[in-house]
Regions:
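Structured, mid-chain assembly/scaffold modules that mediate subunit interfaces
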Residues: 62-223
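Extended interaction regions within the primary functional domain
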Residues: 46-49, 53-54, 90, 115-121, ...
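Alpha-helix capping and helix-coil boundary motifs
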Residues: 14, 112-115, 165, 233, ...
Length: 293
């Protein structure tokens, strides 16, 4: 009979066990003000994503703790760069492929600022700051003079508008800048033509966004909820505490600076006495006075 006991339901634990399990749902005095909305992660990202992203970028630039955390995250994620190793058994072909790969890594950046391994570090930093990064595959022409006619262009999270949520004329849904077909597959990304915060890029009037097929885009992010379509800054859970800690540090430094100042009152017994009890002035007109606490 003991064998069948494992298929039976658990024995009731009594009122105390039920109370312990549902304590988080209580609305008594301690938890009366805790009423978070039950929203989908995508709705939260669409409404608060731009402000969260702006605050995250400011913290990483102005807060030393956040800046160090960003660099540590990138160093632990990619280090000096993830280097692939060929599994081709033909030694001659493997050497040719390896030389071609090494040549391409120096030309991989579409902006011409760094190499393939530097791009990995930039992606890692964007993952920490913005929670996501977009890599656009840019095929090149033969006259561009590249050994491999392909380059990678990094696009920040701001380049894909959070507010672009609409229905395309073809029936596809665009959510936070990402176009989905009728069965929920990603078919395109609607990128801005220029960064919304870059006042130095004053181009002629062009459409606000450009449609890029999904097969030409790598969307790198870590979803934390099922169905999540955009990334969240990795610093988001500690953002408020870091901001308040920064204010506390400034206030504490000001308090210490004020406390370290030496203050006193200057008194004299007669109007004709020297203000500080100094002696006679020297030939340069300067006099020396002593001051004690």
């Amino acid at each position: 009979m003991a064998f069948f006991n494992i298929f039976r339901g658990p024995k009731p634990g009594g009122p105390e066990a039920v109370r312990a399990r549902l304590e988080g749902a209580m609305a008594k005095r301690r938890l009366r003000g805790w009423n978070p909305p039950l929203e989908n992660i995508n709705a939260l990202v669409a409404s608060g994503g731009p402000r969260l992203l702006a605050r995250s970028r400011e913290l990483v630039v102005t807060n030393g703790y956040a800046a160090n955390a960003c660099e540590a995250f990138a160093a632990n994620l990619v280090g000096d760069g993830i280097k692939p190793s060929s599994l081709i058994t033909d030694a001659a072909l493997r050497d040719r492929v390896q030389k071609l790969w090494l040549a391409w890594t120096d030309e991989a950046d579409a902006d011409g600022l760094t190499d393939f391994y530097g791009l990995q570090a930039m992606v890692a930093r964007e993952m920490f700051v913005a929670g996501e990064c977009f890599v656009r595959l840019r095929p090149r022409r033969a006259e561009d003079g590249l050994l491999v006619p392909l380059q990678l262009q990094l696009l920040q999270s701001e380049m894909l508008p959070f507010e672009k949520t609409e229905t395309d004329p073809n029936g596809n849904r665009i959510r936070c800048g990402i176009e989905f077909d009728l069965i929920g597959r990603r078919v395109a990304y609607h990128f801005r033509r220029r960064h919304p915060g870059d006042s130095t890029d004053q181009r002629v009037a062009v459409p606000d966004t450009v449609r890029v097929p999904a097969e030409d885009v790598l969307h790198i992010y870590r979803p934390i909820d099922a169905g999540q379509i955009r990334g969240l800054p990795h610093i988001a859970p500690a953002m408020v505490r870091l901001f308040l800690l920064d204010q506390y540090d400034d206030a504490e430094l000001d308090r210490k600076k004020t406390a370290a100042m030496f203050a006193g009152f200057i008194t004299k017994t007669a109007p004709e006495d020297p203000m500080m009890g100094e002696g006679e002035a020297d030939s340069d007109g300067a006099a020396i006075a002593s001051l004690e606490p």
